[in-house]
């Protein structure tokens, strides 16, 4: 591509709306442009990079034995109601009606569609296993779109669905996808970790997320540097800290005027927050749930949802709290509580003589003890924290933030049973298909590349996903010799399969260099005054070194970079 014919949309300043580097640089380099909140148009340069990521995904999925498919993005509500998920996605699902008042949605994911296809077309074990994938636009009405393509309302996703006759087959399919994902992210030069995860609304038994560590990540990851254990904070088991044994004290009701929060109670009683147990009231659909955790801990709402079998939980309003406790917010406790579930974090059972709310405005109980004073469902209901014991090896955990770029699930029979997707096995028996689901956020992966590969001057694209691989820059537009040799070099590069740019614009060399750095082209060849000596300058974007080499050796130098990156020329 000659840049004189190219739509160059570079900006010298970052738009005020952009908060993170990938968003700033994708806007500044002219990769994307905002159309509405969470909705972006891809400019030619950005689309070219996106397609490079898609092609890597496609190659690895095909190599793993998956077959490409393309489903409709406009989905009838009947399928979602059949699976029981029409309401689960709630306000995130874009719902609409046609002129005949028939309900549809814009697909946020496609389990129902692929299950519907499978029940119509897969009848026998002889057709199994099968793995189908698509690369398609998805739609989710995010409450707070932010960070450019990291959390948008319209995004490109690769989603795959495997169908097997038994769980052993599912394990094989799942492991193939795990390996394919590892290869995909390695080829894209994205440094990420596979972590244990909760299946959430997707359902099923096993799940892993591919997470990129980032300070702006919306997920928290618990990981151990000793044994390589890693899990999303939603999934990570919290190992209880056992308090020193004490003689059980007499339960006492204490007046605590104007002391509602843990901070206020710590000041009032003059003891550490570890001596308090807070009781937090939630609504889980039509049920009221109370959760007890130590005063310095946080409730893990995902664990609570799983414990009560609810698709969603939310903090109860004042009216619900008043009905459950008989008191204002801030005085809830386990003794005399009127709720459907009382969930007690297992750490509480190792505590002695702690302080809880008395279910009476202005009062708390001192010297409360589990079993003697109250009982409930004991389990793990809190978030793991920095420094606590790894559940695998016992060494201290580290907590970091991360961006999810991929997620794989063992769905089992959740959808096939709900939608009656059955096949006939070797013995002539009808059985539900065993399913797996595997997603990659294509836009997110592209953004993650930019987050991990940039400097003060712009994007530093890895060669594998760069929109263009080499840029040829004649330093002086008015120099016939420089322009002629640059054109010849550009033509030679294209002949051997290099995705090349020729900056033939009537601009100063400094402007051309700045644009080349901003858009992140991996290799730059400058045809300058040394061309009269048969020499050009060669520079890699990820290095400060400028090499002066013979013109007749520059093609070989480009080929060398492809070999270093294990890439074949087309």
UniProtKB/Swiss-Prot annotation:
Q: Which GO terms describe its cellular component?
A: cytosol
- From the Swiss-Prot or TrEMBL record, give the protein name: Proline--tRNA ligase
Instruction: List the catalysed reactions.
Output: tRNA(Pro) + L-proline + ATP = L-prolyl-tRNA(Pro) + AMP + diphosphate
Organism field: Clostridium acetobutylicum (strain ATCC 824 / DSM 792 / JCM 1419 / IAM 19013 / LMG 5710 / NBRC 13948 / NRRL B-527 / VKM B-1787 / 2291 / W)
Assembly and partners are described as:
Homodimer.
* Comment field on protein domains: Consists of three domains: the N-terminal catalytic domain, the editing domain and the C-terminal anticodon-binding domain.
The UniProt entry's sequence similarity note says: Belongs to the class-II aminoacyl-tRNA synthetase family. ProS type 1 subfamily.
Gene3D superfamilies, A to Z: Anticodon-binding domain, Bira Bifunctional Protein, Domain 2
Q: Where in the cell is it found?
A: Cytoplasm
């Amino acid at each position: 591509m000659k840049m004189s014919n190219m739509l160059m949309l570079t900006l010298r300043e970052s738009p005020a709306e952009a908060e993170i580097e990938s968003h700033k640089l994708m806007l500044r380099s002219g990769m994307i442009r905002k159309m509405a909140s969470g909705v972006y148009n891809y400019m030619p340069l950005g689309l070219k990079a996106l397609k490079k990521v898609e092609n890597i995904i496609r190659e690895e999925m095909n190599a793993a034995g998956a077959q490409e498919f393309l489903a409709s993005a406009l989905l009838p509500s009947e399928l979602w109601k059949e699976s029981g998920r029409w309401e689960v996605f709630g306000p995130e699902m874009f719902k609409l009606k046609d002129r005949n008042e028939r309900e549809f949605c814009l697909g946020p994911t496609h389990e129902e569609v692929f299950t519907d296809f499978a029940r119509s077309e897969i009848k026998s074990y002889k057709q199994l296993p099968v793995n189908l994938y698509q690369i398609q636009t998805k739609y989710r009405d995010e409450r707070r779109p932010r960070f450019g393509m990291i959390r948008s309302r319209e995004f490109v996703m690769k989603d795959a669905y495997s169908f097997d006759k038994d769980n052993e087959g599912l394990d094989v399919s799942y492991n193939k996808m795990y390996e394919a994902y590892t290869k995909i992210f390695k080829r894209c030069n994205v440094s990420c970790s596979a972590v244990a995860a909760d299946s959430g609304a997707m359902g099923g038994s096993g799940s892993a997320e591919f997470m990129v560590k980032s300070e702006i990540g919306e997920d928290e990851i618990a990981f151990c540097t000793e044994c390589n254990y890693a899990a999303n904070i939603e999934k990570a088991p919290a190992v209880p800290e056992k308090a020193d044994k004490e003689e059980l004290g007499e339960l006492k009701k204490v007046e605590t005027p104007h002391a509602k929060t843990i901070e206020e109670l710590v000041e009032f009683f003059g003891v550490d927050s570890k001596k308090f147990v807070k009781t937090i009231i939630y609504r889980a659909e039509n049920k009221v749930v109370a959760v007890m955790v130590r005063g310095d801990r946080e409730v893990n709402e995902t664990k609570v949802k799983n414990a009560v079998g609810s698709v969603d939980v939310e903090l109860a309003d004042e009216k619900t709290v008043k009905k459950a406790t008989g008191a204002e917010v801030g005085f809830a406790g386990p003794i005399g509580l009127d709720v459907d579930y009382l969930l007690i974090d297992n750490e509480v059972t190792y505590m002695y003589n702690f302080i809880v709310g008395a279910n009476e405005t202005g009062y708390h109980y001192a010297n409360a003890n589990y079993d003697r004073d109250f009982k409930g469902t004991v389990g793990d209901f809190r978030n793991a924290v920095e420094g606590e014991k790894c559940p695998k090896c016992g060494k201290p955990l580290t907590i970091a933030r991360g961006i999810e770029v991929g997620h794989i699930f063992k769905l089992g029979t959740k959808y096939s049973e709900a939608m009656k997707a059955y096949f006939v096995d070797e013995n002539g028996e009808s059985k539900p298909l065993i399913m797996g689901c595997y997603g990659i956020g294509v836009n997110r992966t592209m953004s993650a590349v930019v987050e991990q590969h940039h400097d003060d001057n712009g994007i530093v694209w890895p060669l594998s996903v760069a929109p263009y691989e080499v840029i040829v820059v004649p330093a002086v537009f008015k120099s016939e010799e420089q322009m002629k040799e640059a054109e010849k070099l550009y033509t030679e590069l294209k002949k051997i399969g290099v995705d090349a740019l020729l900056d033939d614009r009537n601009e100063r060399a400094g402007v051309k260099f700045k644009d080349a750095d901003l858009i992140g082209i991996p290799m730059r060849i400058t045809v300058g005054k040394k061309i009269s000596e048969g020499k050009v300058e060669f520079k890699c974007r990820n290095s400060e070194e400028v090499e002066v080499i013979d013109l007749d050796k520059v093609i070989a130098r480009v080929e060398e970079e492809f070999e270093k990156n294990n890439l074949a020329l087309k």
